[in-house]
Amino acid sequence: MDAAELRATQAPIKERYKADPNAALITLKAKGSIDAEGIACKVETGRALAVAGLHPATGGSGLELCSGDMLLEALVACAGVTLKSVATAIELPLKTGIVSAEGDLDFRGTLGVDKEAPVGFREIRLRFDVDTAAPQDKLDLLLKLTERYCVVYQTIRSGPKVSVTMQRV
């Protein structure tokens, strides 16, 4: 897809959202079932069933997916799609690119070993390695716009309001 195709595809969508801001509000959903036997949660991905379990650093076997890894994978996926979309829109040719994310966790927090240890990532690093002949000012713009428009990056960075409920079934 080139810049013209991208604009043509998105123009009517953007116009609809400008005319009716409520049309832009969409609720995305995820659902998982708690495994009756093991310590795992089966997440419906729409394509397959992803089984998440304990990370080996917390006693897991390593056979199931780690939800921390899944968070980083979601960040990489969203950032990669956003980067490519922005590059296309600003007509910055990319030959190839690699998106990587890594994050630091102190597992004492989630295991309740140390009440002062944080539960969750202390730091996340997102990196783009791109093969392009574009000038540095265009790369700076690409990075700035990718950060601005990446949903997962902005969600992690901004920390939205989150509510948690529980009910009997």
Question: What positions do the PLM features span?
Answer:
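Extended beta-strand/beta-hairpin segments
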Residues: 1-73, 85-169
